[in-house]
Every structure is written in structure tokens, then in C-alpha cells.
Amino acid sequence: MLKLKRITSVICSALLVLAIVGCSSDNFEPIPLTDDETEILAAMGDDVNVITDDDYSHTIIELQAHPGNYSGQVYQLEGVYTTESINGVDTSFVYRTLVHDGEKTICGLHLKYLEKEIPDGAWIRVTAIIGTEDYDGETCTVMEVVAVEALAEAGQSQLEWDGVGHQH
């Protein structure tokens, strides 16, 4: 559990600035799927686990806590896109802000192999294979991007949350 708290702390610290400033995709041009991405998604069919607003917090927390259980599975989710410098390397994330009893917590995942230029703060839909990566000796969950698009309209960047899995 201490490892999860440490990993979550690193991710939350990297994203905290954006939570304070706030984000929206109102000023961004949509970035559509490429033809290749569209073909790949069609081929995946029902093998994609779609994370909805209602199950976002529990699913992301579960993916972070037990990445090995989900490695190789395909997930799709929407959220705010950002990059942060971690150990001098620009690192991409998709996240949402969870609200519980007035307290806000950033909850998201690292994006790997993102080939498109997406502006910080854009609302994206990403489909990716769950993988793991070593970070300072800890196993972290990553989303190995298969397809990503920046959408014209943003969804809910803040979601109500029951606090289960909450880290202090």
C-alpha cells in the first residue's frame, strides 16, 4: 500500500498545478482519429473496456493498484490531456479531478507511445493497452496508446467520488 501511495503522490504532484489553474477544451481544434486508428478500433470491436463517468474513479484506482492484473487489456477513457516534466522528461497524462466531501484529488494515467501533438488542457478520448513501467523501483500503470483524438466538446472534468481508495 505504501508503494501505491508513493506512486499516486508522484502522479498527483505532477498534475496538481493543472487542478489549481483549471482546464477546458473550449479553445482547441478537434484532432480526429487517423484512418489507421479507425481501422484498429474497428478490428478491436468488443474487446475494448470503456471507462464511463460512473466507473471512472474505481476503475482508474484499481488499474493503478493492480497493474499486473490488467496488463494487455484494452481500455478507453476520456479526460483532460497534459504533459509534465518528470525527472527532466516530458510525460503525457490523461486525468480527471475527483471530488469527495469538498476535497479534490487528481486521478489519471500515464500515456505512452503518443504520436500526435495534443495541446495541454485538451479533452481527449484515448484507447490504449494497459502496461507497466518501472519508476524508481516501483511498478506503475501506463496506457500504451493505440488511438487518441481531441474532442470538440469537453466532458465532465470533475466527478463526484465516494472516497473509496482515497490517498492522503
Labelled PLM ranges:
Residues 1-21:
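Sec-dependent bacterial lipoprotein signal peptides
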Residues 13, 19-168:
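OB-fold and OB-like single-stranded nucleic-acid-recognition modules
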